[in-house]
Amino acid sequence: MKIRFAILAGLLVVGLLSGLPVQAQQAAGHVERQKGPASRSTAAVTIDLAEGGRIFVGDEIRTGPGARLQIRFDDESMLTLGENALITIDQFVYAPSGDSSQALAIAQGVFRFAAGQIGKLAPDNVALETPVAVVGIRGTVFLGGELTVGMPAGQPHYGF
């Protein structure tokens, strides 16, 4: 009798909890290309990234030593991060026929950003915050961070 009561009580609790609303993460984009270690963190969970992996609003993205990461957002904007970069996806809302906005906080590292549809449709609604400035979109492509370029003989190449 006690076992039957415990089982019924457990099933009741599971049934009640299953009715609670679960907040889904809002997708923002995916990993287009990756070289080296990179991860995304949300609250207390850290997940290693891989090509094709989804990126969500609220994610903190971190690249490791020697790493490069390219993120394609759902509006076709592209963010390329160099090694030891740290950014947060603060906001991403893409509605081709409505209000759209994108906000990224770049805490450290080298980055390159090419605006997508949000930058074309609502350039005032795209912002990238760095430790020393907030960048608003007036053009479409810019590079930030510290970068040293050498030009040895041969064909120059920066990227993957």
How does the language model describe each region?
Residues 17-25:
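Bacterial Sec-dependent signal peptides at the C-terminal "C-region" and cleavage site
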Residues 1-5:
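Positively charged n-region of N-terminal signal peptides that target proteins for export
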Residues 8-18:
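Bacterial N-terminal signal peptides
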Residues 24-160:
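Flexible, surface-exposed loop/linker segments and immediately adjacent secondary-structure boundaries
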